[in-house]
Amino acid sequence: MLPLLQLVPAKLLNSSCSLEKTLQCSCSFHGIPTPSVQWWMGGVPVGVDGMDGSLQVTSTMLGPWANSTISLTEEPEMGMRLLCEGKNQNGTHALSILLMSRKSSLAAQAFVKGLIQGAIYAGIVIALLFLCLLPLIVKHIRKKQAKKAAAIRAKKSSKVRASQELEMSLKPEEPGKPVVATFSESRILEKQDKRAS
């Protein structure tokens, strides 16, 4: 009588991915009975031991071991999922791999480059705008300063006039110098001259 084999569910024991000219991912499963291996790309099953467009699958089974390798000859789309699934009648075990395109790093570099260029262009536009507005700003400042200076001069000249008028009214008349007076002042002066003579 043959000994009964103990049934073992499929279990993933090893997996790896490498990128050279092509992307290669491998999965190794163990189980009794020997698990079957199925690859899924973006939710779609990939054919076993054959070519499927840009995908090539190679599988080998030896005793309780099942090994499978998938090769991608083209770069995957951004965020594409690759699933390696091993199963037998006692269970299923799977590994999901998120594929990232090398182009995605280029997209990030392009984004950063565009961001830097945008900042430089914005700086240039702001500088040109400032240079265009600078004459208007200077003109406005000079007008304000001229108004202030005119107000100060007017204030000073009114003070000077007031002090000169005060001085003139306090100065005694010099003999023989003509006196300029208004009509009412000249009448008063005439009356004073007549009384004196």
From Swiss-Prot:
The keyword Transmembrane applies. Its main location: membrane. The keyword Transcription does not apply. It is found in: Membrane. This is SIGLEC family-like protein 1. Gene3D superfamilies: Immunoglobulins (2.60.40.10). InterPro entries: Ig-like_dom_sf (IPR036179), Ig-like_fold (IPR013783), SIGLEC (IPR051036). Residues 160-179 are annotated as: Disordered. Keywords: Membrane, Transmembrane, Transmembrane helix. It is a single-pass membrane protein.
